[in-house]
Regions:
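Axial heme c-ligation environment in periplasmic c-type cytochrome domains
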Residues: 49-57, 69-100
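Sec-dependent N-terminal signal peptides
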Residues: 4-13
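The canonical Cys-X-X-Cys-His
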Residues: 32-40, 92
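Short, non-ligating residues that shape and space the ligands of small metal-coordination modules
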Residues: 42-43, 63
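Electrostatic cytochrome c docking/interface patches
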Residues: 14-28
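Short sequence/structural segments immediately N-terminal
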Residues: 28, 102-103
Length: 103
């Protein structure tokens, strides 16, 4: 019985940590990415018409956390390289992946 209670508490703390990561990710995304991307759900278009919305990114077929890590750490045309800590990057990725329609 103690083992089950421990597992329930462990799972609950993991869910809480994920929610906090996403909240932090939303803050970082707004500050760092919001100039070009529509960061929040409900924003129909990005300020930069060539930049996808975060909802579009999250729902791109095959999109994974690993793919977003590559995108955020590899220079590519049209997107500046931001200096983010690993934790900041992971929080932004958690936020984007949390926007997936079929979680």
């Amino acid at each position: 019985m103690k083992r089950i209670a421990f597992l329930v508490l462990l799972m609950a703390s993991a869910v809480t940590a994920q929610a906090q990561d996403r909240q932090e990710g939303a803050k970082w995304a707004t500050n760092v990415c919001g100039e070009c991307h529509a960061v929040r759900p409900g924003q129909p278009r990005s300020p930069n018409g060539r930049a996808p919305t975060f909802v579009e990114l999250a729902n791109t077929p095959g999109m994974t956390s690993a793919a977003l890590t590559v995108a955020l750490t590899t220079p590519h045309a049209g997107m500046p390289m931001f200096v983010l800590t690993s934790e900041q990057r992971q929080d932004i990725i958690a936020y984007i992946m949390g926007l997936k329609a079929n979680k």
